[in-house]
């Protein structure tokens, strides 16, 4: 536990020191920052804000994790597990980096095409499966102690889980501080589970990433000086999915990650209902004022009759939701 705290503090310090230099470099090079194409008017002032901050906390977290792992976890099983998680984080980080790079430096509005991004994400999931899942012989989903053996279909589940949650966290990263703190809450919940299981290798990775993310939040809270970009959000979502699989607690991510599930579900429901009503009535209708769900809250709260919610209020509501959901999972598992 001391090792995890020490590593987390080092990650916090290094990220906190490096981030201002990254922001300054961004500004000195006059790189075009975040573009805003949204209907939420209060977001227009954010146009040009530096992005790709995930590059910094990912490099810090993965580098420290590799160093600490090589020094303190020399057995093959732990190194294989740590390598599997870190590789999927790096691969998804690279995917996000390419996406951000094309948008910002090459002025390609959509970045990677949906097909390109999905293909790369599948490859990342396969790498994790080959490095961690196959050697462990795992082929079952653990749900409340019951193991559902899927055989080869477990590969499909792993790919669905990793790709799905990487994109879900990406959708969540839409207002200042929301994704970074939401992921910290989720990681802390998995830190408790890892500690209870004696999985100190996973706990180390969690502690380092939590430290790096807390330092990033110093620059990402409203008004944000920098955004994490796809490089950060895609990697963090993949990390959460990989950790839930590594700890054999896959189902918990549906609850611990309730914020990401809600954000993604709102988009899927909105698109489906809009297409259905357009076909049936000749005009598309909406369930939510705007999606993902955090924009729905910004434009009128839960009821729609309230005044527009500030970003801080939306953040506080969704952070609290994630925290309560995480505590419920821990209560189910250990009380």
Curated annotation (Swiss-Prot):
HAMAP family: MraY (MF_00038). It is found in: Cell membrane. Its main location: membrane. GO terms for molecular function: metal ion binding; phospho-N-acetylmuramoyl-pentapeptide-transferase activity. Keywords: Cell cycle, Cell division, Cell membrane, Cell shape, Cell wall biogenesis/degradation, Magnesium, Membrane, Metal-binding, Peptidoglycan synthesis, Transferase, Transmembrane, Transmembrane helix. GO terms for biological process: cell division; cell wall organization; peptidoglycan biosynthetic process; regulation of cell shape. It is a multi-pass membrane protein. CDD domains: GT_MraY. One of its GO terms (cellular component) is plasma membrane. This is Phospho-N-acetylmuramoyl-pentapeptide-transferase. Pfam families: Glycos_transf_4 (PF00953), MraY_sig1 (PF10555). It comes from the Bacteria. The gene is mraY. The chain crosses the membrane at residues 3-23, 53-73, 78-98, 118-138, 143-163, 174-194, 200-220, 226-246, 251-271, 314-334. It comes from Streptococcus equi subsp. equi (strain 4047). Belongs to the glycosyltransferase 4 family. MraY subfamily. It is an enzyme of class 2 (transferase). Pathway: Cell wall biogenesis; peptidoglycan biosynthesis. Its cofactor is Mg(2+). InterPro entries: Glycosyl_transferase_4, PNAcMuramoyl-5peptid_Trfase, PNAcMuramoyl-5peptid_Trfase_CS.
